[in-house]
């Protein structure tokens, strides 16, 4: 049973209204980022809806007591209680996912990523866990990515050079350009995501690497 079916059209619509037109409550984990104001609004709305579910639980419990001896009514109440519990669990899981996505977005922006969504695609997000306010496993991956793909980040690069100008000896195999591998070259380095980022962020570099890969 979907979350929409569990909550009903009215409650589900309230949350969608907070997310904005075209949003899908169950699609928070698809990689799209959520602005802080929307995060706060939806998080507040979730708390309100969770309270409504708790109130329903209490009402169903009271009805269950009164329905003693009425098997059919008791069975229907039991089904409603089960659906209510599933809805609460779905709310909790989705709230945690929302917090995770918001924390990851913030961490990516703080890391200096030029395009947070593109950099996220290069991370193993399955191994990054949210523990309270900390993202476990994020720093190690970002550090490694900055060393390997420094052109994806703003400011001074971790290899010691200034963005777009690597120190002597760095990227020599690619004409002195700030990258250690060619994403256009067939083989283990071939990467369509990085190609797209290069064409958007540095078209000249993209053309040069593309020509060298032929």
Swiss-Prot record:
It comes from the Viruses. InterPro entries: SCAF. The gene is 11. It comes from Bacillus phage SPP1 (Bacteriophage SPP1). Keywords: Coiled coil, Viral capsid assembly, Viral release from host cell. Homodimer. Interacts with the capsid protein gp13. The keyword RNA-binding does not apply. Scaffolding protein involved in the icosahedric procapsid assembly. Coassembles with the capsid proteins to form the procapsid, in which the scaffolding protein is found within the external shell of icosahedrally arranged capsid protein subunits. In a subsequent step the scaffolding protein molecules are released from the procapsid. It holds the Pfam family Phage_scaffold. Residues 36-105 form a coiled coil. Residues 154-190 are annotated as: Disordered. Belongs to the SPP1-like scaffolding protein family. GO terms for biological process: viral capsid assembly. This is Capsid assembly scaffolding protein. The keyword Cell division does not apply.
